[in-house]
């Protein structure tokens, strides 16, 4: 068969009617043996870019296989499940199935597996390094969600990310390398290319704009001016401040319910909170609301793998419509009907914010993304990043910040400051976010809360 026919067959087997324009050239480059750096929005269909050539190569050269490195178990399980549903040979090697690791790798060596999904940590395991690295090499290595290499790849948090390039260099037959992400400012791109040892990679960039998303920021900053003028003791002022905080918290919960009913009734809802404790608090409140009973689940890294998998399955299948989660959830999760993404608290960086709002509107229909902004959140996040939380409060730390060095703290605080500056600007929120991500020619979206406010000022 001709290569064109083999690719067409692969496209059909994967269930696609046809490839999108933005997918064709990256696929051609991989088929030609060229490294690629693909930067595209979450709804672009990046998985097809490595799945199509992976199937085509296996057809042309039986025994060829693709190694896909993912940051989270949820993403691995989702990818493997989707491929198996299409009768495509896919497997995973994670800490969960390490006991069967030898069997999985033996299947790969026999040519029985076309796609093997793993984590950076498992890639560095003795089993992997001895059974596959010396001889039975993949023809393609894919680093999915490649921004994690820069965001997470540190000596203290996930150092294995920094060893991926070294593992590739050890391989007897150097594979083609593909790095894919939706969020890579220029310094991220340089870091990814150098760390992975990519050879003259072809850059494929698709605009990160999402015209179907309506971006709204709600300011819940406490007005303490009245308290400051009260002729009462400091103790009484503190008590009044706590009452004001509690009232604001209840107002946020009421507004969250209103938004879920208004925008989320036609599909699914993801509600993000910064810490596990916040997730538990919001979840416990929402699940008791009469109009939401039986619809809400929670997800964070403090839960067992079995529990998280069950929750993920219920949400993806539509059995549960609303999920309250930390940043441990959502990266790469493909659920088309998410109509609302709500941040109950301030995210930690512009990159994290963009990644999470990218869960909404993947079907191309209008969706809303709402951020509850509060000065107290900034103080909380700064305190977390600066390491001022004590070890006994470790459960309150975001899932990605359980361990962090001083240099990493300073870098993370800079990212937080960039997000705060973005929220304080008088111009389009989406435009500012895209410019941070390197898309300098991004136009104003015309529909975010800032654009709407400016339009009202002009009387348009």
Predicted regions and their residues:
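Short alpha-helical "packing" element that flanks the helix-turn-helix/winged-helix DNA-binding module
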Residues: 23-26, 419
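Helicase motor core with emphasis on the C-terminal RecA-like subdomain
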Residues: 5-10, 18-21, 31-47, 54-58, ...
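Interaction interfaces in information-processing and related assembly proteins
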Residues: 379, 386-405
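Alpha-helix N-cap and coil->helix boundary residues
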Residues: 2, 21-23, 428
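C-terminal accessory/connector segments of nucleic-acid motor ATPases
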Residues: 293-294, 396-460
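Alpha-helix N-cap/N′ positions at the starts of helices
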Residues: 2, 159, 411-414
């Amino acid at each position: 068969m001709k290569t064109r026919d083999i690719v067409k067959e692969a496209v059909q087997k994967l269930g696609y009617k046809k490839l999108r324009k933005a997918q064709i050239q990256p696929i051609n480059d991989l088929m030609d043996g060229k490294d690629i750096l693909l930067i595209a929005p979450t709804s672009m269909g990046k998985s097809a870019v490595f799945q199509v050539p992976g199937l085509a190569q296996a057809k042309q050269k039986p025994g060829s296989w693709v190694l896909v490195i993912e940051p989270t178990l949820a993403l691995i399980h989702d990818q493997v499940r989707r491929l198996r549903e299409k009768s495509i040979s896919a497997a995973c090697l994670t800490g969960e199935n390490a006991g069967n690791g030898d069997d999985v790798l033996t299947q790969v060596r026999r040519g029985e597996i076309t796609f093997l999904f793993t984590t950076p940590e498992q890639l560095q395991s003795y089993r992997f390094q001895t059974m596959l690295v010396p001889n039975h090499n993949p023809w393609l290595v894919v680093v999915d969600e490649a921004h994690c290499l820069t965001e997470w790849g540190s000596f203290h948090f996930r150092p294995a990310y920094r060893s991926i390039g070294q593992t590739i260099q050890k391989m007897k037959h150097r594979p083609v390398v593909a790095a894919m992400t939706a969020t890579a400012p220029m310094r991220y791109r340089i870091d990814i290319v150098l760390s992975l040892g990519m050879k003259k990679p072809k850059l494929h960039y698709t605009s990160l704009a999402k015209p179907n998303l309506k971006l709204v920021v709600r300011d819940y900053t406490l007005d303490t001016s009245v308290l400051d003028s009260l002729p009462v003791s400091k103790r009484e002022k503190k008590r009044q401040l706590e009452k004001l905080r509690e009232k604001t918290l209840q107002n946020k919960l009421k507004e969250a319910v209103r938004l879920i009913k208004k925008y989320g009734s036609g599909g699914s809802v993801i509600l993000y909170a910064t810490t596990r404790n916040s997730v538990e608090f919001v979840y416990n409140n929402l699940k008791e609301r009469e109009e939401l009973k039986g619809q809400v689940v929670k997800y964070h890294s403090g839960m067992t793998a079995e529990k998280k998998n069950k929750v993920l399955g219920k949400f993806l299948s539509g059995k549960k419509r609303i999920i309250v989660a930390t940043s441990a959830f959502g990266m790469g999760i493909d659920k088309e009907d998410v109509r609302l993404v709500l941040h109950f608290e301030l995210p930690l960086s512009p990159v994290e914010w963009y990644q999470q709002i990218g869960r909404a509107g993947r079907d191309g229909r209008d969706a809303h993304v709402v951020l509850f902004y509060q000065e107290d959140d900034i103080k909380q996040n700064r305190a977390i990043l600066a390491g001022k939380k004590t070890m006994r409060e470790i459960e309150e730390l975001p899932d990605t910040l359980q361990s962090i060095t001083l240099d990493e703290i300073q870098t993370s605080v800079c990212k937080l400051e960039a997000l705060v500056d973005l929220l304080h600007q008088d111009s389009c929120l989406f435009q500012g976010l895209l410019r941070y991500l390197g898309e300098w020619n991004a136009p104003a979206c015309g529909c975010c809360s800032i654009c709407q406010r400016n339009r009202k000022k002009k009387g348009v």
